[in-house]
């Protein structure tokens, strides 16, 4: 196995073009486990840790450009206001040591359905900035996951950054595991309210071959909130609406039985998390709305 260590982003792109099968490594929290257990033995391993820009982020007027190697710890500490859903998901990642090393780029590159960042990225409507010597493009997160641990990257492409709009409403993340830390998700759920467009987006992890959105549940909830005037009157969401939303989220899943949980349990857990996170986010929205009205 040859070890490539580019000193710049341009060198990394050139190396990836020359060795399309080279496996990039930054935090190493996924790749090194696979190599240590002999599940993977790439001919070339590309270390990206000398490329400082991958560990940086930029906050613009409307969104955040998050470098592929920004550690989860930094997201928790510095981007909680702009990216609350991703910050909550980051807090659940493994241990402090792994949160100090791992980043969203690795989660996306591995594309495991159990990756903690995926539900939050789906709910926020993120875009993945991919680049090769041929040029750069942005891949909508909805189009990024193409199969079990497969993504939309071309063989010569690397993930440079992730673009995420600043939260314009409450976001939540919930995860079920066999313990509270150092755990691979049995299933996970993310939700984001977007008051500016009067829409709700979801993200589900570890309950289908790929991370997914519960689009039927979103469409139902968007229609129910609009028809009931909930965005304007700030009323409590009725139990029947919350239950139907939860049931549709559970129905969106296509889980398997494995050592971490059964398919039926995963569906049940997703429904519970959907109902709870909807309640939490809507209460936050109502509270913020009442504060705004009181100030006016």
Feature names for model-found ranges:
Residues 1-296:
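C-terminal structural segment of proteins
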